[in-house]
Amino acid sequence: MDHEDMKSRALPFVLATEAIQTLQQEKHPELLPDCKSQVTFDYGKKRIDTFLISTQHQETADLVDVKLICARVMMKIASAYGLNTDFRVLVNPTGRFVTGGSFADSGVTGRKIIADSYGGMCRHGGGAFSGKDPTKVDRSAAYMARRIAKDVLRHGYARKCEIQLSYAIGISEPVGIYVNTFHTGRLPAGTSVKWIRKTYDLTPAGMIDFLGLKYVDYNYTSTLGHFWRQWLPWENDSLPYAAARHTTEK
């Protein structure tokens, strides 16, 4: 019986959650409540690729100490599950994180994320689209993943395709790319990932430019979902991008 069967949850979710729980239980005086964690996991090799923790901390805290505390917790959790500890460690990659909670982020987001996307047919990372500008990968990378999946089908590389892009705060390139063609693909998964990295600029700036996300009227996406309508640039593969950027729904 593997870890996922024992926990009835995805292993990366278990690792990330238990890391946060451990930090809460240890009650480090340097750390404050706002904390998030993310694990990029290679299911094929059964190993952790990247472990991220971003935690709020006291104004007086030394960031080196914060990183040591979090890295130790990462190693502890990975070892408890018999997993590798030579993964990429990311702790507060954007730097100091003093102001947190609703004082740092506010807005009505997260309302119907499944209805906004694929109705449960595809995996969803949990980040909402609406209420965020396209510099947030919750929005831009979701649209880009959709576009890439459509391109895979359009080029005849597969009959079905799901693209997953995983990002870490403060890192512009995705820390993980996963391609699932449900046994319909013509290319090995590793080759598909290399093709994606070579073909597309997956930084926030690159995706914004490629899809013309500064020119989209997002009011239209507030109803009937964020996909399926051909005038949206991540859906429209027949118009040149210059035209798609300025197309509006009739």
Label the predicted regions:
Residues M1, S37-Q58, G101-C122, L165, ...:
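Short beta-strand elements
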Residues E4-Q24, K132-G156:
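Alpha-helical support elements that line or immediately flank enzyme active sites
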Residues Q21, Q25, M75, G120, ...:
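Short, intrinsically disordered, mixed-charge
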Residues D62-L153:
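Glycine-rich anion/phosphate-binding loop at the beta-strand->alpha-helix junction
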